[in-house]
Every structure is written in C-alpha cells, then in structure tokens.
A protein has these predicted regions:
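Cysteine-centered motifs
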Residues: 14, 18, 26, 33, ...
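Boundary at the C-terminal end of the N-terminal hydrophobic targeting segment
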Residues: 71-75
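An acidic, Gly/Ser/Thr/Pro-rich helix-cap/linker signature
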Residues: 76-166, 172-175
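Short, functionally critical alpha-helical segments immediately adjacent to catalytic or ligand/cofactor-binding
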Residues: 116-127, 181-196, 236-239, 294-295
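Secretory-pathway/luminal and periplasmic proteins that interact with or process carbohydrate-rich
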Residues: 125-132, 193-203, 214-219, 242-248, ...
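Substrate-binding/active-site groove segments that recognize
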Residues: 205-217, 258-273, 294
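Acidic, glycine-anchored loop motifs typical of Ca2+
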Residues: 274-283
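C-terminal soluble interaction/assembly domains
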Residues: 316-409
C-alpha cells in the first residue's frame, strides 16, 4: 500500500483535503471539505491499475489539480447559500385598482388623493410575497422545544444583557410609568429584532401595496387579511404624510412591521410614544422611544401590574377533563377552583389567583406537549403576536436575561 496527502489552496475559507490510498489495484480517494461553517466528507473508490512511477506521479498531480478546482467550486456553492436574500420587485404599471386604492385611502385617512396617487405610483410589486403569507403546511408539526431554542440562546441573551445595561434608565422609567416589567420589554425587543439588528429590508410601501392588491386568494382568511393590509397601507401613508419630509422609503418586515419593536402602521399610530421627549416619535432609530412604546402597547391591552404571566401545569389524571380545559384555547376562562375540579393540580400561588386562567398547550413535534397555566397577562402578551409559542419565548428570554443581570451585580 502506498499513499499521498495533498491540501489544496484555500478559497473563501474553504479547504479540501485529499488522501489517496493505493490498495489491491484500487485507488481510494478521500475528499474532505472544511469551510468555516461546515464539514463535508466524500470517499470514492476508483478501480484503476497504475504500475509505473510516472503514471502514479501524473495521477497524484491530477488529483491535486482537481482538489484545487473543487475547493473553489464548493466555496462558491457555500457562498451562494449565504448571500443576502435578494428582494425582487416589478412595476405595478398603470392600473385602475391603484387609482381606486388611492381614492379609498384618501377618503379613509383624510389625506390628499393626489399625494396618495403619487406615492402609489412609486410602489413596486414584491415577487414571492404571496407565498410568505400562506400558513405553514399542516404536515409541519409545531415544536415548542425547537421554537424556544431559536430565541433562548447565548448570543441573543448576551445582546439582551447589553441592551438592558445600556438603557437601564429608560427601561426602569417605562416600568414605573406603565407598570410593565423591564424583562418583558427586553424580551419583546429581543425576539422581534434581536435588539435592533434585524428590522427587515423590505420597503414597507411596496409590501403593503402588494398585499393590499394581491393577497393570495387561496388563504383561508384571504378577504379579512387583504382588508387588513389595505387598512395598514392607509395608516402608513397617513403616518408618512404627517412627517416633515414625507419619506416613504422606510423598510421593515415582509408583512410591513417596522422599527425596533416591529410595529405595524396602525400600532405605530395608536401606541408609539415620544419617550425621550425630543418632540418626535422614532421607532426606527431610537430604542428609547421603542421601550416606552412597547410598554404603552401592553398597558393599552390590559396589562395588570404585579400579576404573573403563567404558572406551572400539573394534572390529576384520574379526574382530568383536558378537552374542556383546552376548549377556550388561550383565553382565560376558568377560575382556579374550576380548574382544580377538572383535574388541574395548581401551585399554592395559582390557587390564590383572583382572575381567570387558561390551560395553554404547546406541541413538541412527535414528543409529548408542554403545558402552562396562563393568566390574563399571558393573554395580553399574545396580543402583540397571536401565538402562545411567541408569548412564552418572550417571557422566558426576558426572565433569563433578568437572571443574568441579577447575577452580574
């Protein structure tokens, strides 16, 4: 047996290692690609007879050359995967629907129709947006454990600690003003935008105009959702019209949510506050305004100061009536006593809870579901995003960051 080892040249952090064995008139070729973000291993056996030294030398040289070329090719492939997402748009063109849309928005929002027409004439249709609006296939089971791991992870926790430390005064002032705990505000901004790092790159005008005119008709709530985005487009244009420069080149998520807290235009209009007192509301670049606005949002939806968001859930299987407990979904509908009558085993704190409670079920793929007992405040958190998975991720992220802050003192 004889062997040779080659390392190709690097290309974009990609290195291919080739190891050649000659055994039993067979050449065994091992290729390992180790870019910084992955490791791929290939092994190929080539039944080839090479008896002379010059032929072996030529073969090894050919392998080395192939490795060098493959390195570049593989690196290019990996680089392609990591390119930023390209947003493709096309013109709407002159259409009667745009004129009617401008007329409706002008009437609803009391802004000049000529100005609205001009703004909509600059809007472009976002390609592929309709697919993003469709609900996930039913074949994709929900998984709380996987969802939780996306948000409760070291980098986001570290960023949350820095955000808390940097904006300690504003966070505590928001808590004192609105009664909403610091950790909840920090949790929301962390889940929504990774503390301002991911605020979206779609032009909000393009997104909302596209969805107002081309919401996918096969969506189960197509009519309702299309009306919602038409309304949001109106709020957005009114918001822009009120600004001194009337800038419409604001970017956000593929649904039109904007800024540090990812407010939709209607939420910006109703709940955004000038929390730093500089005379203007800015959720795009001013985290202090975002802090006050998130707290104001929760207060407006009925946050009750001092009330927990949830309690642990345990069951008395002998008398458990789970179907009845789950029927109202996450809407608090049962007193503590009623829950216990239906088979819940509540902690002493939960037993003394004055308001209604809900049994919240979170699926874990093929594994057993997780459960918590949600309070009215848990339900309030779901008004920010109508998902119990989202609400619990926000709550847990904030709690972990609060613990890190406490331990650092």
């Amino acid at each position: 047996m004889s062997g040779a080892h080659f390392v190709s040249s690097t290309f974009r952090m990609c290195v291919i290692t080739c190891f050649v064995h000659m055994r039993d008139e067979c050449i065994e070729l091992s290729l390992t690609c180790k870019p910084s973000f992955s490791s791929i291993f290939y092994r190929v056996k080539l039944p080839i007879l090479i008896t002379s030294f010059p032929m072996r030398f030529l073969f090894f040289f050919a392998v080395f050359f192939a490795c060098t070329c493959s390195s570049a090719a593989l690196a290019a492939v990996h680089g392609k995967k990591h390119k930023p997402h390209q947003i493709r748009t096309t013109p709407f063109g002159p259409r009667a629907e745009l004129a009617q849309l401008a007329s409706d928005i002008s009437q609803d929002q009391q802004i000049p129709v000529a100005w609205v027409r001009h703004q909509l004439s600059n809007a472009r249709r976002v390609q592929g947006l309709e697919k993003l609006m469709m609900p996930p296939p039913t074949s994709s089971p929900k998984n709380w454990t996987a969802y939780q791991a996306r948000f409760i992870e070291p980098r986001r926790i570290e960023a949350g600690v820095k955000f808390w430390q940097t904006h300690k005064e504003a966070l505590e002032r928001a808590q004192n003003t609105y009664g909403v705990p610091v950790e909840l505000i920090v949790g929301v901004i962390g889940v929504e935008t990774f503390y301002g790092q991911h605020m979206g790159k779609y032009k909000v005008l393009d997104v909302l105009t596209t969805l107002a005119l081309h919401f996918p008709p096969e969506h189960p709530r197509a009519q309702e959702r299309q009306a919602f985005f038409k309304s949001e487009l109106g709020y957005f244009l009114k918001m822009v019209h009120a600004q001194p420069k009337g800038q419409v080149a604001i970017t956000g998520s593929y649904a039109g949510a904007m800024g540090w807290p990812q407010f939709m235009p209607s939420s910006w209009t109703r709940f955004a506050v000038d929390f730093d007192g500089d005379g203007r509301i800015d959720l795009l670049k001013n985290p202090v305004d975002a802090i006050g606005s998130v707290a104001n949002y929760f207060k407006a939806f009925g946050w009750q100061t001092g009330m927990p968001t949830h309690y642990p859930a345990q069951f008395d299987e002998a008398k458990l009536d789970k179907s009845t407990l789950l029927a109202p979904d996450i809407l608090p509908s049962f007193s503590a006593a009623s829950m216990q009558d239906k088979g819940m085993v509540l902690t002493s704190d939960a037993q003394q809870h004055k308001g209604n409670l809900a049994l919240v079920e979170l699926f874990n793929g093929s594994d057993s579901p997780s459960y918590v007992v949600g309070t009215e405040n848990f339900y309030v958190v779901t008004r920010y995003n109508w998902s119990s998975y989202y609400a619990l991720a926000v709550i847990e992220l904030g709690a972990v960051i609060a613990s890190e802050i406490k331990n650092a003192r």
